[in-house]
Structures are given as C-alpha cells and as structure tokens.
C-alpha cells in the first residue's frame, strides 16, 4: 500500500523514490512526476515556469531590439569588396566582357608574333634528327655492353647505316619516294632472312 503524500510537496500521490523519472535520486522541478500511471511535468510548472519564461523574455527584449537595429556588417563589407574589386582571384570575373576581349586580343597578337619570329623546322629535319638520335643511342649501348664484357654486341659493317624500327621506317615525313627506295634496297636482305628461316 502506497503512502499518500500531499501534492504540495512536489511529489505527487503515492510516488516512491524508485519511481522518479529517469532514475533520478533527488527531486527537482525539471523532472516530471508519476501521477495516476503516467508521467507529467513537475508540480507547479504550468504557471510558475511560464511566468519565469515571460519575465526572461521581457528582460531580453531591449537587447534584442538593439541587435535588430544595428547595421549589418557582412553586406557592407561585401559591397565594399565588390566596389573596390575584391580579391585577385575573383577580380577577373568581375571585369566587363569588353575588357576581357581586348586582353585576349593582345595576348593572341603577342603569341602570333612570337610564333612568326621562331625559326620554322621542316618535318624532314625532325625525322633526320630522330634517326641520328636512334643511331647514337644504339652506338652508345653497344659500346657500353662491349666495355662491360656482358654479352658483347659485335659492331655492324657500317655504323652510319642503322636498321630502324618499322614505325620509323614508314614515318609519314619520309614521303612516298623514300619509302619506295627503302623497300627496293632492302628487298634482297629480307629475302635472305626468309630463306634462312625456312632452312
């Protein structure tokens, strides 16, 4: 049988210590109380808390009005940045299209003048330089291997005439005449290699 305790004690009817909300051991105005098999707010919260809240709101009202009437600093700073030009990162985006078009035309003119002043190199010269670089690389490799004594590569009959890879032999810059000449002059060697493979 539960003990009847007056509600003026902020405990409720027949509320024991183990039946406090959330397992609380000490009674407080923040904890709800168990009344007639359901939890409700603490005793006296319906009137007293509302009065306290209204009083706090009335006390803070002048401060809120001062804050509301204060000028907004962020839009002012943004407006100033926009007028002055902003950061260097976004300054180009704010320039007018006319200014940007003029700057592009100047850059194109400078690049065109630099390209016209540069010496033009024909494709045949590039191909000759590539062939020379391949020959030099092969000669250096052969020399390095023979000096080390590891799998020495015998020198070919002619160091100037180097058999090039197929991609280089049929390079577009060689032209039809050079490709035909290469096929005619290497036909005998190819036939001999085919005969050797068959035997």
UniProtKB/Swiss-Prot annotation:
Q: Which GO terms describe its molecular function?
A: DNA binding
Described function: Plays a role in the inhibition of host immune response within the nucleus. Interacts with cellular nucleosomes and immobilizes the host immune danger signal HMGB1 on chromatin. In turn, prevents HMGB1 release out of the cell and thus decreases inflammation. Also plays a role in the wrapping and condensation of the viral DNA. May also promote viral genome import into the nucleus.
Q: Which domain of life is it from?
A: Viruses
Give me the Gene Ontology terms describing cellular component.
Answer: host cell; host cell nucleolus; viral capsid
Keyword field contains Signal? no
Q: Which residues form the propeptide?
A: 2-23
**What organism does the record attribute this protein to?**
Murine adenovirus A serotype 1 (MAdV-1)
Q: Which residues carry this modification: N6-acetyllysine?
A: 26
What modifications follow translation? Cleaved near the N-terminus by the viral protease during virion maturation to form the mature protein.
Q: Which InterPro entries match?
A: Adeno_VII
* Name of this protein: Pre-histone-like nucleoprotein
Which keywords does UniProt give here?
Acetylation, DNA-binding, Host nucleus, Host-virus interaction, Late protein, Phosphoprotein, Viral penetration into host nucleus, Virion, Virus entry into host cell
* Site positions (Cleavage): 23-24
| Other facts noted in the record for this chain | All late proteins expressed from the major late promoter are produced by alternative splicing and alternative polyadenylation of the same gene giving rise to non-overlapping ORFs. A leader sequence is present in the N-terminus of all these mRNAs and is recognized by the viral shutoff protein to provide expression although conventional translation via ribosome scanning from the cap has been shut off in the host cell.
Where the record places motif Nuclear localization signal is 189-199
Residues where N-acetylserine is found: 2
Q: Which HAMAP family match?
A: ADV_PVII (MF_04056)
């Amino acid at each position: 049988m539960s003990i009847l305790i007056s509600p003026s004690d902020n405990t409720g009817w027949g509320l024991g210590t183990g039946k406090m909300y959330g397992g609380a051991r000490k009674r407080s105005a923040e904890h709800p109380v168990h009344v007639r098999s359901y939890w409700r707010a603490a005793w006296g919260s319906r009137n007293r808390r509302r009065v306290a809240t209204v009083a706090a709101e009335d006390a803070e009202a002048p401060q809120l009005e001062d804050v509301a009437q204060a000028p907004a600093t962020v839009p002012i700073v943004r407006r100033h940045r926009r007028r002055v030009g902003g950061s260097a990162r976004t300054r180009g985006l704010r320039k007018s299209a006319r200014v940007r078009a003029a700057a592009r035309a100047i850059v194109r003119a400078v690049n065109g003048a630099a390209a016209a002043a540069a010496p033009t190199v024909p494709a045949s010269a590039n191909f000759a330089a590539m062939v020379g670089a391949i020959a030099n690389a092969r000669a250096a490799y052969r020399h390095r291997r023979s000096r080390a004594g590891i799998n020495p590569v015998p020198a070919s009959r002619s160091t100037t005439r180097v058999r090039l890879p197929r991609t280089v032999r049929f390079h577009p810059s060689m032209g039809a005449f050079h490709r035909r000449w290469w096929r005619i002059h290497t036909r005998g060697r190819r036939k001999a290699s085919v005969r050797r493979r068959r035997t």
